[in-house]
Amino acid sequence: TTTFLCPQSDAMIGWKRTKPSYEEEYKADAPMSDRSQYGHGYTFPCLFRIGNDGWVLVSETGVDSRYCGSRLSDVSEGNLYTVAFPMAEENNGNGTVAPAFALPGATPWRTITVGDHLKPIVETTVPWDVVSPLYETKHDYRFGRGTWSWILWQDGSINYDDQVRYIDFASAMGYEYALIDNWWDTRIGHQRMKSLVEYARDKGVELFLWYSSSGYWNDIEQGPVNRMDNAIIRKREMKWLQSLGVKGIKVDFFGGDKQETMPVSYTHLTLPTNREV
């Protein structure tokens, strides 16, 4: 048996102390006996190849605001793995490692998908099959394709003219959306964003805007900051987004997987829905 596993990084290291960011490199067909790069195990989902006999995918689903996210431990004697809780250093050392909840309660699902080839692994619906919707929405989600200038042109592309180019690109390709990444609040501004949303709509394109998760858990400077970690400011921002007709947000750089982080993530999902964003 060999593995395709993404190692869990040390916490509070890397760029602006944002790790673990779940972007580490994996080794293809690594032996099960290998220890993880950082000694903290692996980030879900975890893929194993059983020689010529098939594949196994181990993962987690159904994490909500009342629990924490987990990971797979390093391998122990006998090629055994366990489910591991977040590291103490995550969230800048704040918060608890072990979750707690009132009874009756339930832990997230840990799932194992088995296939004699990769097709059932790729196409599995088990992450949705075993859970129920957590809340009702006021509108239907419209999935689609989009353009994103940052992935190629980085921070320098977050200006009005370059975003017009990427909106035009989305329109020409027949894509539904365009994502405007960090620094838009200072390099484009709230006032000009209104005209950019209107320009995009005339082109048949809707916009997503980037936000920092903010908080005390990293050193991120990219704006907008201090908008998503304060309930009053967050509601005000959502009202503004709704008034412009912005269709969605990308919230970046959470501090970890501790139980304290999950309600923040949950709020970022439910509040936009209530504001039709």
Regions from the PLM with identified roles:
Residues T1-D129:
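N-terminal accessory beta-strand-rich subdomains and adjacent acidic, glycine-rich linkers
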Residues G105-V114, E123-F169, M173, Y177:
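An acidic-aromatic substrate-binding cleft motif
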Residues V131-L134, D161-R165, H190-L196, M228-E237:
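Alpha-helical scaffolding within the catalytic cores
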Residues T267-T273:
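Conserved small/polar residues in nucleotide/adenosyl-binding loops
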Residues E206-D257:
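Active-site-adjacent "subsite" loops/lids of carbohydrate-active enzymes
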Residues L152-Y211, G215-Y216:
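Aromatic- and glycine-enriched glycan-recognition loops and surfaces
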